[in-house]
Protein backbone atom coordinates (compact mmCIF):
# COMPACT_ATOMS: atom_id res chain seq x y z
CA UNK A 1 0.00 0.00 0.00
CA UNK A 2 1.37 3.44 -0.96
CA UNK A 3 1.90 6.20 1.59
CA UNK A 4 -0.96 8.17 0.04
CA UNK A 5 -3.28 5.18 0.31
CA UNK A 6 -2.19 4.53 3.90
CA UNK A 7 -2.87 8.15 4.80
CA UNK A 8 -6.30 7.96 3.19
CA UNK A 9 -7.17 4.78 5.08
CA UNK A 10 -5.97 6.39 8.32
CA UNK A 11 -8.21 9.40 7.73
CA UNK A 12 -11.21 7.15 7.11
CA UNK A 13 -10.47 5.08 10.21
CA UNK A 14 -10.01 8.16 12.38
CA UNK A 15 -13.32 9.61 11.24
CA UNK A 16 -15.30 6.59 12.45
CA UNK A 17 -15.77 5.88 16.17
CA UNK A 18 -15.00 2.43 17.56
CA UNK A 19 -18.17 0.35 17.07
CA UNK A 20 -19.78 -1.85 19.70
CA UNK A 21 -19.80 -4.81 17.31
CA UNK A 22 -16.05 -4.89 16.60
CA UNK A 23 -14.99 -8.51 16.14
CA UNK A 24 -11.74 -10.45 16.51
CA UNK A 25 -11.38 -13.69 14.56
CA UNK A 26 -9.19 -16.65 15.51
CA UNK A 27 -9.20 -20.42 15.04
CA UNK A 28 -11.34 -22.78 17.13
CA UNK A 29 -10.24 -22.37 20.75
CA UNK A 30 -10.70 -25.84 22.18
CA UNK A 31 -9.56 -28.19 19.46
CA UNK A 32 -7.67 -26.31 16.73
CA UNK A 33 -5.69 -23.18 17.64
CA UNK A 34 -1.97 -23.67 18.25
CA UNK A 35 0.27 -22.05 20.84
CA UNK A 36 1.71 -19.31 18.62
CA UNK A 37 -1.64 -18.21 17.19
CA UNK A 38 -3.30 -18.34 20.60
CA UNK A 39 -0.52 -16.11 21.97
CA UNK A 40 -0.92 -13.64 19.11
CA UNK A 41 -4.68 -13.50 19.61
CA UNK A 42 -4.37 -13.00 23.35
CA UNK A 43 -1.84 -10.19 22.81
CA UNK A 44 -4.33 -8.32 20.61
CA UNK A 45 -7.16 -8.94 23.07
CA UNK A 46 -5.00 -7.60 25.90
CA UNK A 47 -4.03 -4.54 23.87
CA UNK A 48 -7.66 -3.70 23.09
CA UNK A 49 -8.65 -4.23 26.72
CA UNK A 50 -5.87 -1.86 27.78
CA UNK A 51 -7.29 0.69 25.34
CA UNK A 52 -10.75 0.06 26.83
CA UNK A 53 -12.10 -0.87 23.41
CA UNK A 54 -14.79 -3.59 23.31
CA UNK A 55 -14.16 -6.61 21.11
CA UNK A 56 -16.10 -9.80 20.52
CA UNK A 57 -14.00 -12.92 19.95
CA UNK A 58 -15.31 -15.21 17.22
CA UNK A 59 -13.73 -18.60 16.52
CA UNK A 60 -13.73 -19.90 12.95
CA UNK A 61 -12.07 -23.03 11.61
CA UNK A 62 -10.96 -21.12 8.50
CA UNK A 63 -9.83 -17.93 10.29
CA UNK A 64 -6.29 -18.27 8.90
CA UNK A 65 -7.67 -18.30 5.36
CA UNK A 66 -10.10 -15.43 6.06
CA UNK A 67 -7.26 -13.16 7.19
CA UNK A 68 -5.95 -10.63 4.63
CA UNK A 69 -2.36 -11.51 5.61
CA UNK A 70 -2.96 -15.22 6.17
CA UNK A 71 -2.20 -14.74 9.86
CA UNK A 72 -4.38 -14.54 12.93
CA UNK A 73 -5.83 -12.82 14.70
CA UNK A 74 -7.57 -10.24 12.58
CA UNK A 75 -10.20 -7.70 13.56
CA UNK A 76 -13.28 -6.55 11.67
CA UNK A 77 -14.11 -2.97 12.65
CA UNK A 78 -16.76 -1.19 10.60
CA UNK A 79 -15.73 -1.84 7.00
CA UNK A 80 -12.05 -2.32 7.88
CA UNK A 81 -10.24 -5.65 8.30
CA UNK A 82 -6.81 -5.54 9.96
CA UNK A 83 -4.58 -8.45 10.97
CA UNK A 84 -1.71 -8.87 13.46
CA UNK A 85 -0.76 -6.75 16.46
CA UNK A 86 1.49 -4.18 14.75
CA UNK A 87 -1.02 -3.04 12.11
CA UNK A 88 -3.85 -3.22 14.67
CA UNK A 89 -1.90 -0.89 17.00
CA UNK A 90 -1.51 1.59 14.13
CA UNK A 91 -5.16 1.25 13.15
CA UNK A 92 -6.29 1.90 16.73
CA UNK A 93 -3.89 4.85 16.99
CA UNK A 94 -5.53 6.38 13.91
CA UNK A 95 -8.78 6.32 15.87
CA UNK A 96 -7.17 8.29 18.68
CA UNK A 97 -6.27 5.46 21.06
CA UNK A 98 -2.61 4.92 21.95
CA UNK A 99 -0.86 3.28 24.89
CA UNK A 100 2.59 4.62 24.06
CA UNK A 101 2.01 8.33 23.37
CA UNK A 102 3.34 9.14 26.84
CA UNK A 103 6.76 7.66 26.05
CA UNK A 104 9.64 9.76 24.78
CA UNK A 105 11.52 8.82 21.61
CA UNK A 106 14.19 6.85 23.46
CA UNK A 107 11.55 4.86 25.34
CA UNK A 108 9.62 4.20 22.12
CA UNK A 109 12.78 2.87 20.48
CA UNK A 110 13.42 0.67 23.52
CA UNK A 111 9.84 -0.60 23.45
CA UNK A 112 10.15 -1.55 19.78
CA UNK A 113 13.45 -3.32 20.46
CA UNK A 114 11.88 -5.47 23.16
CA UNK A 115 8.91 -6.23 20.93
CA UNK A 116 11.36 -7.41 18.26
CA UNK A 117 13.05 -9.56 20.89
CA UNK A 118 9.75 -11.23 21.78
CA UNK A 119 8.87 -11.86 18.14
CA UNK A 120 12.35 -13.07 17.22
CA UNK A 121 12.77 -15.33 20.25
CA UNK A 122 9.47 -16.35 21.87
CA UNK A 123 7.33 -16.48 18.73
CA UNK A 124 10.04 -18.28 16.77
CA UNK A 125 10.53 -20.74 19.62
CA UNK A 126 6.79 -21.44 19.68
CA UNK A 127 6.80 -22.10 15.94
CA UNK A 128 9.87 -24.33 16.28
CA UNK A 129 8.27 -26.35 19.05
CA UNK A 130 5.01 -26.75 17.12
CA UNK A 131 6.44 -27.73 13.77
CA UNK A 132 10.06 -28.90 14.25
CA UNK A 133 9.96 -30.88 17.50
CA UNK A 134 8.91 -34.36 16.39
CA UNK A 135 7.19 -35.30 19.66
CA UNK A 136 5.04 -32.15 19.64
CA UNK A 137 4.29 -32.47 15.93
CA UNK A 138 3.22 -36.10 16.29
CA UNK A 139 1.21 -35.82 19.48
CA UNK A 140 -0.33 -32.34 19.19
CA UNK A 141 0.31 -30.15 16.16
CA UNK A 142 -0.85 -32.22 13.19
CA UNK A 143 -4.01 -33.41 14.91
CA UNK A 144 -5.03 -29.94 16.12
CA UNK A 145 -4.13 -28.05 12.96
CA UNK A 146 -6.03 -30.41 10.69
CA UNK A 147 -8.90 -31.14 13.08
CA UNK A 148 -11.67 -29.18 11.29
CA UNK A 149 -11.01 -30.86 7.95
CA UNK A 150 -11.82 -34.33 6.56
CA UNK A 151 -9.20 -36.88 5.53
CA UNK A 152 -6.96 -36.48 3.54
CA UNK A 153 -7.22 -32.67 3.57
CA UNK A 154 -6.37 -32.57 7.28
CA UNK A 155 -3.00 -34.23 6.61
CA UNK A 156 -2.30 -32.24 3.44
CA UNK A 157 -2.84 -28.88 5.15
CA UNK A 158 -0.78 -29.86 8.19
CA UNK A 159 2.18 -31.07 6.12
CA UNK A 160 1.97 -27.98 3.92
CA UNK A 161 2.11 -25.71 6.97
CA UNK A 162 4.96 -27.72 8.46
CA UNK A 163 6.95 -27.37 5.25
CA UNK A 164 6.38 -23.59 5.24
CA UNK A 165 7.53 -23.20 8.85
CA UNK A 166 10.59 -25.44 8.39
CA UNK A 167 11.58 -23.41 5.33
CA UNK A 168 11.31 -20.24 7.42
CA UNK A 169 13.40 -21.79 10.20
CA UNK A 170 16.17 -22.63 7.75
CA UNK A 171 16.07 -19.10 6.32
CA UNK A 172 16.58 -17.48 9.74
CA UNK A 173 19.23 -19.92 10.90
CA UNK A 174 17.06 -22.04 13.21
CA UNK A 175 16.89 -25.08 10.94
CA UNK A 176 19.65 -27.01 12.70
CA UNK A 177 18.95 -25.89 16.26
CA UNK A 178 18.25 -28.49 18.91
CA UNK A 179 15.37 -28.24 21.33
CA UNK A 180 17.82 -27.50 24.15
CA UNK A 181 19.25 -24.58 22.19
CA UNK A 182 15.77 -23.20 21.55
CA UNK A 183 14.87 -23.49 25.23
CA UNK A 184 18.10 -21.65 26.10
CA UNK A 185 17.04 -18.84 23.74
CA UNK A 186 13.70 -18.67 25.53
CA UNK A 187 15.46 -18.48 28.88
CA UNK A 188 17.68 -15.64 27.69
CA UNK A 189 14.65 -13.76 26.38
CA UNK A 190 12.81 -14.21 29.67
CA UNK A 191 15.89 -13.08 31.57
CA UNK A 192 16.08 -9.88 29.50
CA UNK A 193 12.36 -9.22 30.01
CA UNK A 194 12.61 -9.92 33.73
CA UNK A 195 15.53 -7.52 34.13
CA UNK A 196 13.72 -4.78 32.18
CA UNK A 197 10.52 -5.22 34.18
CA UNK A 198 12.23 -5.31 37.56
CA UNK A 199 9.80 -4.40 40.34
CA UNK A 200 7.61 -2.20 38.13
CA UNK A 201 3.99 -3.20 37.45
CA UNK A 202 4.56 -2.72 33.70
CA UNK A 203 7.60 -2.39 31.47
CA UNK A 204 7.38 1.40 31.44
CA UNK A 205 6.34 1.86 35.05
CA UNK A 206 2.66 2.40 35.91
CA UNK A 207 0.91 2.33 32.54
CA UNK A 208 0.86 -0.58 30.08
CA UNK A 209 1.94 -0.28 26.47
CA UNK A 210 1.65 -2.59 23.49
CA UNK A 211 4.85 -4.26 24.73
CA UNK A 212 3.02 -5.36 27.88
CA UNK A 213 0.18 -6.75 25.77
CA UNK A 214 2.60 -8.67 23.54
CA UNK A 215 4.64 -10.12 26.40
CA UNK A 216 1.50 -11.10 28.31
CA UNK A 217 0.02 -12.83 25.26
CA UNK A 218 3.06 -15.03 24.80
CA UNK A 219 4.00 -15.73 28.42
CA UNK A 220 0.45 -16.42 29.60
CA UNK A 221 -0.18 -18.77 26.69
CA UNK A 222 3.09 -20.61 27.30
CA UNK A 223 2.17 -21.00 30.97
CA UNK A 224 -1.36 -22.29 30.30
CA UNK A 225 -0.88 -24.49 27.21
CA UNK A 226 -0.45 -28.23 27.72
CA UNK A 227 2.41 -29.58 25.62
CA UNK A 228 4.22 -32.92 25.56
CA UNK A 229 6.33 -31.76 28.51
CA UNK A 230 6.72 -28.71 30.77
CA UNK A 231 10.18 -27.60 29.63
CA UNK A 232 8.96 -24.43 27.89
CA UNK A 233 6.70 -23.24 30.71
CA UNK A 234 9.38 -24.03 33.30
CA UNK A 235 11.65 -21.47 31.66
CA UNK A 236 9.04 -18.76 32.32
CA UNK A 237 8.33 -19.99 35.84
CA UNK A 238 11.95 -19.30 36.79
CA UNK A 239 11.14 -15.57 36.83
CA UNK A 240 8.76 -14.64 39.62
CA UNK A 241 8.23 -11.07 38.46
CA UNK A 242 7.10 -12.30 35.03
CA UNK A 243 4.60 -14.64 36.70
CA UNK A 244 3.29 -11.76 38.83
CA UNK A 245 3.13 -9.59 35.70
CA UNK A 246 0.94 -12.16 33.91
CA UNK A 247 -1.34 -12.55 36.89
CA UNK A 248 -1.65 -8.77 37.27
CA UNK A 249 -2.80 -8.30 33.68
CA UNK A 250 -5.10 -11.31 33.82
CA UNK A 251 -6.82 -9.96 36.94
CA UNK A 252 -7.05 -6.33 35.86
CA UNK A 253 -7.90 -6.63 32.18
CA UNK A 254 -9.69 -9.95 31.91
CA UNK A 255 -11.22 -11.05 35.21
CA UNK A 256 -12.38 -7.53 36.14
CA UNK A 257 -13.64 -6.75 32.64
CA UNK A 258 -15.40 -10.09 32.27
CA UNK A 259 -17.69 -9.23 35.18
CA UNK A 260 -19.46 -6.79 32.91
CA UNK A 261 -18.94 -8.53 29.59
CA UNK A 262 -18.77 -12.08 28.33
CA UNK A 263 -16.85 -11.19 25.16
CA UNK A 264 -13.39 -11.86 26.60
CA UNK A 265 -12.63 -14.43 29.24
CA UNK A 266 -9.51 -16.44 29.93
CA UNK A 267 -9.84 -20.12 30.67
UniProtKB/Swiss-Prot annotation:
GO cellular component: SAM complex
InterPro entries reported for this sequence: Glutathione-S-Trfase_C_sf, Glutathione_S-Trfase, Metaxin_GST, Mito_Protein_Transport_Metaxin, Sam37/metaxin_N
Keyword annotations of the record: Acetylation, Membrane, Mitochondrion, Mitochondrion outer membrane, Protein transport, Transport
Compartment list: Mitochondrion outer membrane; Mitochondrion
Pfam families named among the record's database cross-references: GST_C_6, Tom37
CDD domains: GST_C_Metaxin2, GST_N_Metaxin2
Domain of life: Eukaryota
Function: Involved in transport of proteins into the mitochondrion.
Self-association state and partner proteins as the record states: Interacts with MTX1/metaxin-1. Associates with the mitochondrial contact site and cristae organizing system (MICOS) complex, composed of at least MICOS10/MIC10, CHCHD3/MIC19, CHCHD6/MIC25, APOOL/MIC27, IMMT/MIC60, APOO/MIC23/MIC26 and QIL1/MIC13. This complex was also known under the names MINOS or MitOS complex. The MICOS complex associates with mitochondrial outer membrane proteins SAMM50, MTX1 and MTX2 (together described as components of the mitochondrial outer membrane sorting assembly machinery (SAM) complex) and DNAJC11, mitochondrial inner membrane protein TMEM11 and with HSPA9.
Designated name of the protein: Metaxin-2
Gene: MTX2
Amino acid sequence: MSLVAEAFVSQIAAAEPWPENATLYQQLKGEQILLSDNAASLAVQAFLQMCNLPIKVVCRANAEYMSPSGKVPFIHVGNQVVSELGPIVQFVKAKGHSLSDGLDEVQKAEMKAYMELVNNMLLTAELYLQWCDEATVGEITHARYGSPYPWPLNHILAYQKQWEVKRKMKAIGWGNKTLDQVLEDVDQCCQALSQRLGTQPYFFNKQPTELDALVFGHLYTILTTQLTNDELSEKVKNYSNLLAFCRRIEQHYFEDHSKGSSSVRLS
